[in-house]
UniProtKB/Swiss-Prot annotation:
Its EC number is 2.1.1.242. This is Ribosomal RNA small subunit methyltransferase J. The lineage of its organism: Bacteria, Pseudomonadati, Pseudomonadota, Gammaproteobacteria, Enterobacterales. One of its GO terms (molecular function) is rRNA (guanine-N2-)-methyltransferase activity. The gene is rsmJ. Keywords: Cytoplasm, Methyltransferase, rRNA processing, S-adenosyl-L-methionine, Transferase. S-adenosyl-L-methionine binds at residues 101-102, 117-118, 153-154, 171.
């Protein structure tokens, strides 16, 4: 995959070249999307809109730390949707990991989560965030036990995963409504890189075959159900709904 690669570390140790080789990234000087290695982390930037800033994965500080400490935890909609209750903490495959937010919420609540991400740039960002998270004195221990990354396309990988999870979680990128100047800056940068998941409808069936208990699909509240398969079961919030489908028992 082509992207502009920028090293701002000043280290001159070739770390960015190693990273590019690992994720199959090719430097393209003219690409509007840039993957930047800073002294602190790896981040994604939209070069023609510098005011949007850089996107990076941070499980240790910032919004994620706040959500871990002060968020709803087990009471969060995603936790309710996957079925966390009492001692029941399902094993989850997050088949559209993105920046890992929902996966992290579930891991924080006690679930073991395997994240699948097919885009190599996003996978590199996730891997960078995980490495810093694993090294953190406060959360590193449980994060290593509960949150893992698999770089693969869910369309093919869902049939190969073992052991089977109790829950498969899907949050496909859905095109935002027009005139959404207020779409978060981060989402604008992210969508510029990955675009909508036009093949997302193909995920529902393999997800249902893989999950032993349920499949949870996060949708904007204005979006039709995935693959146009309606379900009466959903956890609904102000802006989203978490549609719930039966899996395939062992």
């Amino acid at each position: 995959m082509k992207i502009c690669l920028i090293d701002e570390t000043g280290a001159g140790d070739g770390a960015l070249s190693v990273l590019a080789a690992r994720w199959g990234l090719e430097h393209d000087e003219d690409n509007l999307m840039a993957l930047v290695l800073t002294p602190e982390h790896l981040e994604l930037r939209k070069r023609d809109e510098p005011k949007l800033g850089g996107i990076f994965v941070d499980f240790v500080g910032g919004a994620m730390a706040h959500r871990r400490k002060f968020g709803g935890g087990r009471g969060e909609a995603v936790a309710k949707a996957v079925g966390i209750k009492g001692d029941y903490l399902p094993d989850v495959v997050d088949a559209t990991a993105g920046l890992g937010r929902d996966a992290f919420v579930l891991a924080s609540a006690g679930c073991r989560v395997r994240m699948l991400e097919r885009n190599p740039v996003v996978a590199a960002l996730l891997d960078d965030g995980l490495a810093r998270g694993y090294a953190d004195a406060e959360i590193g221990g449980w994060l290593q036990e509960r949150l893992q990354l698999i770089h693969a396309s869910s369309l093919t990988a869902l049939s190969d995963i073992t052991p089977r999870p109790q829950v498969v979680y899907l949050d496909p990128m859905f095109p935002h409504k027009q005139k959404s100047a207020l779409v978060k800056k981060e989402m604008r940068v992210f969508q510029s890189l990955v675009g909508p998941d036009l093949d997302a409808d193909g995920l529902l069936e393999p997800a249902r075959l893989l999950a032993t208990k349920r499949v949870v699909v996060k949708r904007p509240n204005y979006a039709p159900p995935l693959a146009n398969v309606a379900t009466p079961n959903a956890v609904v919030t102000k802006g989203h709904r978490f549609d719930i489908y039966a899996g395939t028992p062992v």
